[in-house]
Amino acid sequence: MGPGENLVTLARDAARDALKNAGVELSQVSGIFSSCNPTTDYLMPTLAPMVAAKLDIKHVLACNVGMGCAGGVQALQACFNQLLADSARGKVSTYILVTGDHISRMLDPESWKTAILFSDGISAVVVTNNPEATGGFVIEHVASECYAGEEVAVINLPNPLAAREAGSTGPCLLQMRGRGVFEFGTRIAPRVKELVGITNFEEFYVIPHQANIRMINELIPTFDIKPEQLYVDGITKIGNISGAACFLGLEDIMSRPLANNYDKILLCAFGAELQVAVAVLSR
């Protein structure tokens, strides 16, 4: 983060850019969904209401989904479900979805397990049920599942209040067991096909969570796709930006000619909460 910057100011600026690109005015915004772990300056309020305040948007829904690296796609699911409810009432709505983390502030700079992997950043997208909207993608399907009961200690961030009550005076930093994360990510990949109900990914470009290049490459045989159908540039260029990773990847490929080669996009993410979330987008 630069001088005077924090996650809220980055999210505000990203939201403004997303609205401009979508041709949407602030007055048309029905609410803000966000996905952020406790990496902002406050545990409460969360990212969504703080961004709403920065944008000077009043009397709107502001909801945060804190589900680790899967949170961005899960927040998209929450937003999608809200739009379904709005449509059922005959209401046209437009929401901003911002997702990301200032994750460097909770890393141990001497830990090679985390310090060289994670990055700070934010993404923003506009989601609407407006039948007159043009460009962008249609959300065909979203789904998610939780596996946290299996092994919570794979990735965790201790609660500073609980640590203080236990007599600890040290910093509460992110803890990760890399082997456990890798095993979960590779084991859960076949389940993604079941969640989206698709067996043939020939028409798809796949944007997985950018956590580990070996884990990402495991999707090639699992989905029976070609290497050029798989996005890997996030982890190699900017690192793991938590719930923003899939959306930053989507923005990245939209500026490339290869994006025109595929009619469908698969977003698949998994995260610290041992959650998996998927979304199918089409043109």
Feature-to-residue mapping (PLM):
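Claisen-condensing/thiolase-fold acyl-transfer catalytic domains that form or cleave C-C bonds
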Residues: 12, 39-40, 44-45, 58, ...
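Conserved active-site "lid/cap" helical segment
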Residues: 1-30, 43, 109, 158-204, ...
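Conserved beta-strand elements of the Class I
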Residues: 30-33, 94-96, 204, 266
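A short glycine/serine-rich beta->alpha loop
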Residues: 1-3, 37-38, 61-65, 110-112, ...
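Flexible, glycine-rich active-site loops centered on histidine and acidic residues
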Residues: 84-121
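Condensing-enzyme catalytic core mediating Claisen C-C bond formation in acyl metabolism
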Residues: 1-6, 109-183, 270, 283
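Glycine/charged-rich beta-loop-alpha catalytic/anionic-binding loops adjacent to active sites
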Residues: 30-34, 52-66, 106-108, 225-233
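Short beta-strand segments
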Residues: 66, 95-101, 127, 267-270
